[in-house]
Regions:
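Conserved catalytic loops of nucleotide-sugar-dependent glycosyltransferases that act on lipid-linked
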Residues: 122-228
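Short beta-strand-to-loop element that shapes/binds the nucleotide-sugar donor at the catalytic cleft/hinge
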Residues: 109-126
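C-terminal catalytic/acceptor-binding lobe
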Residues: 179, 183-340
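Active-site-proximal specificity loops/subdomain of glycosyltransferases
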Residues: 22-73
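Conserved small/polar residues in nucleotide/adenosyl-binding loops
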Residues: 341-348
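Conserved donor-nucleotide/metal-binding helix-loop-beta segment in metal-dependent transferases, i.e.
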Residues: 91-112
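A conserved acidic beta->alpha catalytic loop
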Residues: 8-18, 37-39
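Short beta-strand-to-loop acidic/aromatic patch adjacent to the donor-nucleotide binding site
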Residues: 76-85
């Protein structure tokens, strides 16, 4: 492993220094993208002047800038991306994730990770289990068979934040700036690559991370916002393929989804009983009710904002518009990290 790139959001200068100290123990070359620092803010403003900047802060924006920095280095051919809140992390996860694209005897350009979502003897992964899968099945019943829907449904865990790819993928991939990132990446793989260039791999026997609140009272937070962003990502992709949507279709989709999701709640209840896991049916059905409501919210946002462009421009386009940008990005990040390799004292390490 040659480079480690860490994207850091919502951090002031003190928090950035804490992050630098924390990651200083890594023996590999590593840089932190301080997205809220003056250097990267200045570069983002330059992109905004050309209508090329991500419209909002978010996971997709963070990942996009990390991709740009990796491109600017020019010395990396296989790249793996994973979340930083994994509680069950070990080196085997990373090795299994990157191996399919790093092995020169394979011809894969993209690899998606998957894993069981059980922790503390509870069934996890509510958004994937209770939103994505029943939503895809409901869409097929509502608008008919679509190859794209079948493609997304073929992935064991479509919302996994762990994937790897060859360097050539980075220049022309268009990703959303919000929580639709994982679906957006799969959509780009569907559009740009043949099926035999894509794979998925089991990367962990057990996986757990920081859990988000469902946020029943605030659609702008937690799993509620995540669900809206994911629904919008799927709808926009289908619309880009010529599918027509209206409020009446969204009402039918909501009703169909609700029935599908309740059936899945019963399936997971039986799975949990058989495997001696805990599952709260009330919490499960509360999530389903929220996701059903958010289908209508996402549909209204989609219909009310037909010109909204959630995808960030490709790095190829940025490079064409501002040829010096990637080099300036590299310089800015190096400047922010200029003290990163200065070994902190034992006192600094805590």
């Amino acid at each position: 492993m040659q480079n480690i790139v860490i994207g850091l959001d919502k951090a002031n200068q003190k928090e950035f220094k804490i992050a630098r100290n924390f990651f200083s123990r890594l023996p590999q070359r590593h840089e932190i993208l301080w997205n809220d620092g003056p250097n990267l803010k200045k570069l983002n403003k330059q992109l905004a002047e050309q209508n090329l900047a991500p419209q909002e802060m978010g996971k997709g924006r963070n990942v996009w800038y990390c991709m740009g920095y990796i491109l600017s280095l020019g010395d990396t051919e296989a790249i793996a991306l994973h979340d930083c809140d994994i509680l069950t992390y070990n080196k085997n996860l990373l090795a299994r994730l990157v191996y399919p694209v790093a092995n020169p005897r394979f011809n894969f350009d993209f690899c998606k990770g998957y894993y069981p979502r059980v922790s503390d003897n509870k069934v996890r992964g509510r958004v994937a289990r209770l939103l994505v899968t029943p939503l895809l099945r409901a869409l097929e019943k509502t608008i008919g068979f679509k190859e794209y829907i079948s493609f997304i449904d073929s992935f064991r865990y479509p919302l996994a934040g762990e994937f790897s790819f060859r360097r050539r993928v980075l220049k022309d991939i268009r990703i959303p700036f919000d929580w639709g990132l994982e679906i957006g990446v799969l959509s780009e793989m569907y559009r740009n690559y043949a099926g035999n260039r894509l794979c998925q791999v089991d990367i962990a026997d057990n996986y757990d991370h920081k859990h988000q609140d469902i946020s029943l009272s605030d659609m702008s937070k937690g799993l509620s916002k995540m669900s809206i962003d994911i629904i919008k990502a799927v709808i926009r992709k289908l619309a880009s393929q010529g599918e027509t949507f209206s409020m009446s279709i969204f009402r039918s989709l909501k009703a169909t989804y609700y029935r599908e999701a309740l059936d899945f709640v019963q399936i997971y209840k039986k799975d949990a009983i058989m495997n001696d896991y805990e599952i709260d049916v009330h919490e499960e059905e509360t999530a389903v009710e929220l996701f059903a409501q958010n289908i209508m919210h996402a549909g209204k946002i989609f219909l009310d904002s037909p010109m909204e462009s959630p995808n960030i421009p490709t790095w190829s386009r940025v490079d064409t518009a501002i040829p010096s940008f990637l080099n300036n990005l590299k310089k800015a990040i190096k400047e922010d990290n200029c003290l990163l390799y200065t070994s902190p004292s034992p006192r600094d390490r805590g």
